[in-house]
Structures are given as C-alpha cells and as structure tokens.
C-alpha cells in the first residue's frame, strides 16, 4: 500500500510545473494563500482518460483560507493526531454505477526545512529525506459513484504521526517541514482494487490545504484559530492569546508524574514556617531523644507542646537515627520519663527505642497476685487458705481434665534448648510440658486479655524431665527454666482461646517460690 502510488503513476510532488499544466476541466488555481471569489471552486491537478467530468469541491474552504493566510500548522505526535480543519470534499461527475476508490496521501510541498522566528516562518535548511509514501484509503472504499456523490466525503479519521516505525497506517511526517495533501479518485478494477497499469484515476490538489508539521503550535494566531473553530477545544475559550498559546505548547509535551510525598517534602523545606514548625512539633514521647542529642536537660512533660498532627519528614529521620549509644550516654536517671533499653536487643544495629517494662524478678508475690486478680480474667480460688498461693493452686478450665494438686504431683521441669524462631501461641503453648505444671482449672470462661498482660518470646523443648516433689520441696522458678532473653509487647491479641490464655498466664504470672517456701 505504501508503494501503490507508483503502481498507477501518481506524481510524487503535486506542485511540479508539468502537473499544473495537466490541469483539466477546473478553474485556474489561485495563488498560494490568495482568497478566491468562488469559495467552492474545484481544483484538479491530474486527470486520466475516462475520468473527465469529475469535479471536487473543498468543504469549509473559507476556514482553510483563514489558516492558510496565517500559515497552517498541523500537530504530529507519536500516537497520531487528526487534522484540523478536517479534510472534507464534495464530489460530482462520477458514474453512479461504477465503483470508485477514494484515497489520500500527503507529499512534501518543497525541499526546505522551516523555523518560526520573529513571528514568521523562514527557511532554515534543506529538508530531511522524505518518509516512504503512505496512502490513506477511505473506509467506504470501494463504493459506487452514487454513494460518493450522495454526501460529503470526510477524511477526518486520517492521523499524522512522527513515528517512523508506526504500525497503524498513519501518515508519517517530519516536523518543521511543509506538506501538501492530495486526493485521488481511482476507478476500481474487476477485483475491486487498484494498482494495475490500466487503472484510471485522477488527482485533485487544493493549495490552501498545505501546512507545516509541528510537534507544538508555533504561531499563537494558529492556536487562537484552532480554539475558536475546533468544537473539541471549548475548554480553552475565554483565555487570552498568550495563555492559550502557552497551554497549547504544554499539552504537546510529556511531563513526569511527581509523587505527592516529594511535593510535600519540597513544600516543607521551602516554607517560611518550616523551621518554626519543626521546633514546635516535637511530640511528648520524643522529647527526651532530642534533648539527649542536644545535651540539654529536658523540661517536664507538661511543658512539651502538643504533638503535631502533620509531622514533617525531618522528624522521622531524627527518630530513626537515635541509636543505642545515645541512650547509654543519657541515662534514665537523668531523664526519669525516658524508658531505658532492654538488656538484650535483637541486634547491635537496633536503631529504634524499645520501651522498658518492669521485670518479673523485681515484683513481689503479693503485687503480682493482686495484678493478676485485676485482669479481665478473674481467677476463682477454691483452695483452703493454708495453701501457699491460693489464687493459682486450684485452677481449672472446661477444656482440660482435672489433675492432682502440686503437693502430690510429678512436676515436669523444662530443659532449656537452643532458641527457635518465634511461633504463635498455639504452636508452643498447647503442647504437653506446660499443661502438667498447672493444677486443675476451675470452670470459667476465658474473657478478654487485659492491657497489662505479658507474653514471652521463647520456644522450649517438649521432652520433659520428671522428678518427685513433696510438700516441702519448692517449685522451681519459671525464670530459671527459660532462656535469658524475653520480649514483652503491648500488642497482645484480645481474643485468645482458653488454653492459650491460661498458658501465658501460668508462665508469665506464676510466683517465684524459693526452696524454703
């Protein structure tokens, strides 16, 4: 299809002297850009034998002349852009029963390259090599002469592109080059095609349709004309000429998408209030960190300003760069409201603060028993008062069988093993070694877990070591049966099953008994 014009002898450039001399049954061509008295005067460049009497009239010729007087520009894009004004013609003189094929091509008007400077177009050099010629065949082709003469023939779906590898059949053009559209009327052969040597055709050229291909409008007058007459550009109407010209140039370019976070960061950096906001946006739980870095004794929490609901990006960088070394330099005694690090952190490069929590060894039995009674799970004691720990002596759950008391049972000691990765409670608290350590549980449901409950992160072996214990033999402290590293968190699930809940409570809250108790 690209080389079909050579098949039936189409001239490469329509403005050659010989092609002008071969003009047939049409009025003389007007000068380039000069208005004609007859707005519907047909123009023809070449006619073969058998195609006499065919006349073509350009639709909206007055509009084309307005653009031509200023210097028509057509946008070309990689994806393809339609022409405006659209190329529409009225055809007469066809044989109503003969089938015709209507097609267009766009050829270079000259061998120059142009530039727009000082509000005018001027030649800047020699033209680049022309792209391989492409023909745009009207979608209704082939059709009878009666069909073509019944209504306007529109080529508004024709698109212009600057993509030299375009696979969609668009017309390929070079930017800043002048082109001339041409209309070809071809008599279809017996196969409803064309291209043979005996194919009859005629070519029609309208000089006022010549244009310069551009990637963005150069002349603001063309921009204004397009906006005033293009029904798809209504959104730009009502603005001044310079603004419309600027917007039209911007629309033809591709700009990168800037993330919102980058915009916020730049606004925060360049805002005249950014430094003041940073100084006043320190939250109460981060005040000790900044005071530790600056070496200034911190005020009380009441003097700290309220937290900023929109923290800046600089605050986060300061938070995550507080290291353990800074915490050691600024002890907890210097800032009583600053909670110290735990004794063992997961790694040496731990760059965030862990809140310190009261350890089991520092709590008395009465305090821990009282705190256990204050939890959402209220323990019901059914043992006599003479027992050492009545609140943990006879506890039962409706899902476990009752067991003998501690005074006559075989106690299962847990042997510490190598640390295993963290598992959910259902994985290492529902097995055998911890269940015999608990006495029979009283019948009660498992309510929600309170905020102050602790959980530990450790995994133990499930191979028990059995020893006999009498009433005088104390129960080994759970702290001595576990590895030294614990991790306490506040985010404990609130809907644990009964066995999970009591396993955690039995291990984390059981009193420490010495050998003399």
UniProtKB/Swiss-Prot annotation:
Pfam families reported in the protein's UniProt record: T-box
Region (Disordered) location: 1-46, 270-313, 331-369
GO BP, sorted A to Z: animal organ development; atrial septum development; atrial septum morphogenesis; atrioventricular bundle cell differentiation; atrioventricular node cell development; atrioventricular node cell fate commitment; atrioventricular valve morphogenesis; bundle of His cell to Purkinje myocyte communication by electrical coupling
InterPro entries, per the entry: p53-like_TF_DNA-bd_sf, T-box_DNA-bd, T-box_sf, TF_T-box, TF_T-box_CS
Protein name as catalogued: T-box transcription factor TBX5
Assembly description: Monomer. Homodimer (via the T-box); binds DNA as homodimer. Interacts (via the T-box) with NKX2-5 (via the homeobox); this complex binds DNA. Interacts with GATA4. Interacts with KAT2A and KAT2B.
Compositional bias of kind Low complexity: 34-45
One GO cellular component, as annotated: nucleus
GO molecular function, one term: RNA polymerase II transcription regulatory region sequence-specific DNA binding
Extent of Polar residues compositional bias: 271-300, 357-369
Main location: nucleus
PANTHER family for the chain: T-BOX PROTEIN-RELATED, T-BOX TRANSCRIPTION FACTOR TBX5
């Amino acid at each position: 299809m690209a080389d079909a014009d050579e098949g039936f002898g189409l001239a490469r450039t329509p403005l050659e002297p010989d092609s002008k001399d071969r003009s047939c049954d049409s009025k003389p061509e007007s000068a380039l850009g000069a208005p004609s008295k007859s707005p519907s005067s047909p123009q023809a460049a070449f006619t073969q034998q058998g195609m006499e009497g065919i006349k073509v009239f350009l639709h909206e010729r007055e509009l084309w002349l307005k653009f031509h007087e200023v210097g028509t520009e057509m946008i070309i894009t990689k994806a393809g852009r339609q022409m405006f004004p659209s190329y529409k013609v009225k055809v007469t003189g066809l044989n109503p029963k003969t089938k015709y094929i209507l097609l267009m091509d766009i050829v270079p008007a000259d061998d120059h390259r142009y530039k727009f400077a000082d509000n005018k177009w001027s030649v800047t050099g020699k033209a680049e090599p022309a792209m391989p010629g492409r023909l745009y065949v009207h979608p209704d082709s082939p059709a009878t002469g009666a069909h073509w003469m019944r209504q306007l023939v529109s080529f508004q779906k024709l698109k212009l592109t600057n993509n030299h590898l375009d696979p969609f059949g668009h017309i390929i053009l070079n930017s800043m080059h002048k082109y001339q559209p041409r209309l070809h009327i071809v008599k279809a052969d017996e196969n409803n095609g064309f291209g043979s040597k005996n194919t009859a055709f005629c070519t029609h050229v309208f000089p006022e349709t010549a244009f310069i291909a551009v990637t963005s409008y150069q002349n603001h007058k063309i921009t204004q004309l397009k906006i005033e007459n293009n029904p798809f550009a209504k959104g730009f109407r009502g603005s001044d000429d310079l603004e419309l010209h600027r917007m039209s140039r911007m629309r033809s370019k591709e700009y990168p998408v800037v993330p919102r976070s980058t915009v916020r960061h730049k606004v925060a950096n360049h805002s005249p209030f950014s430094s003041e906001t940073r100084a006043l946006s320190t939250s109460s739980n981060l005040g000790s960190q900044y005071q530790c870095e600056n070496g200034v004794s911190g005020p009380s929490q009441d003097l700290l300003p309220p937290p900023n609901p929109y923290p800046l990006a600089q605050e986060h960088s300061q938070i995550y760069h507080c290291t353990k070394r800074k915490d050691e330099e600024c002890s907890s005694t210097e800032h009583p409201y600053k909670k110290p690090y735990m004794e063992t952190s997961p790694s040496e490069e731990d760059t965030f603060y862990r809140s310190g929590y009261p350890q089991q060894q520092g709590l008395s039995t009465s305090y821990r028993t009282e705190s256990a009674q204050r939890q959402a799970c209220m323990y019901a004691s059914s043992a006599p008062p003479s027992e050492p720990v009545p609140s943990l002596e006879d506890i039962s759950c409706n899902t476990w069988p009752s067991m003998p008391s501690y005074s006559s049972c075989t106690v299962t000691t847990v042997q510490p093993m190598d640390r295993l990765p963290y598992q959910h409670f259902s994985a290492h608290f529902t097995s055998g070694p911890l269940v015999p350590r608990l006495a029979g549980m009283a019948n009660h449901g498992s309510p929600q877990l309170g905020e102050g409950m602790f959980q530990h992160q450790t995994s133990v072996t499930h191979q028990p070591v059995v020893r006999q214990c009498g009433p005088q033999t104390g129960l080994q402290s759970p702290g001595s049966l576990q590895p030294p590293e614990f991790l306490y968190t506040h985010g404990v699930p609130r809907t644990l099953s009964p066995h999970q809940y009591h396993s955690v409570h039995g291990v984390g809250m059981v009193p420490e008994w010495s050998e003399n108790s």
